[in-house]
Amino acid sequence: MIVAPVVLSIFLQLFVQAAQPWKALDPEQALYVYKRCYEDHLPAGSSRVTYLKSWNAWKLEPNDAVTHCYAKCVLIGLQLYEEKDKAFKSERIPVQHEAYKTLNEANSREVTEYQQALASINAGDGSCVALYNAYLPVHNKFVDLSRKLYHGTVEGAAKIYAAMPQIKQKGESFFAYCAKKIWGGYNKKEWKRGRNYELSGSSQFKKVIDCIFRGLRYMDDSGLKVDEVVRDFNLINKSDLEPEVRSVLASCTGTQAYDYYSCLLNSPVKEDFKNAFDFHELRSADYAFLLRGKVYEGPEQVKEEMKHLNTTVHF
């Protein structure tokens, strides 16, 4: 019988995930959270600048539904709150501190107080407003500390980037970073073939694609994030392809990044996927791209903007 081994495999995967210790967030991961929450929650119109100035200053203002849901987004992204448990995760604060304490100048006593404060509050029903009201007093008291812990100062983040060349740097696309990480520098021949969307199937190229999928947030340890792939099609004005994209991914026989990548490239949406993928490469080097009001203007515009990136293999 086939079902039993499959079910057992799923349970084993979940067990391994649950057993893994929580890992501190690096500056790239934190920056992604902030910018993505901006993208998802900043309103259009004249009020946008007001919110942007306030949030940039780490002020959770104005006290309204927009800021409430922005705050929830950041708390989830920084993993200070778990949606599935409807609970704050205060035990992760000292882990974050230990990882960067020699660089971020955070005070250990204050870290303990911050942890205790977060442990003392209740998430209620987990709604945006409930989380906001619970966390706001903690935020206001420990905002300077939390900025140090979660890479929210320009100086602090720059210091960590400089000390950790092994993480993705600002201005570096995830495609370039992953090629560097897996190959230790560009395997120019295979990388050029790969960026021309040839499916070499080599073990190293599969690792590069896995790294890229994780960097673009298409995947994490729990599996494929279909909504993230669909979002990239939406951003190149191809929202009408959503049913087909979902169908292609759902019918893919493998569950690894390279499997999904291959399925998309062997599907009727392959040309649109290439355009979406290339556009995300550009944005992965500049998390503020969309926030500056820039939009997709076609593959030629993407190629032109890619020429200004020094850390990628150009088209």
Curated annotation (Swiss-Prot):
Keyword terms, alphabetized: Blood coagulation cascade inhibiting toxin, Disulfide bond, Hemostasis impairing toxin, Secreted, Signal, Toxin
Keyword Magnesium belongs to the record: no
Protein name per UniProt: Long form salivary protein D7L2
Quaternary structure note: Interacts with host coagulation factor XII/F12 (inactive and activated). Interacts with host coagulation factor XI/F11 (inactive).
UniProt gene name: D7L2
Family annotation (PANTHER family): GEO07291P1-RELATED, ODORANT BINDING PROTEIN-RELATED
Biological role stated in the UniProt entry: Modulates blood feeding of female mosquitoes on vertebrate species by binding and sequestering different mediators involved in the host response. Binds leukotriene B4 and leukotriene D4. Exhibits anticoagulant activity targeting the intrinsic coagulation pathway; binds coagulation factors XII and XI, preventing generation of activated FXIIa and FXIa.
Gene Ontology MF annotations: odorant binding; toxin activity
Keyword Lyase: no
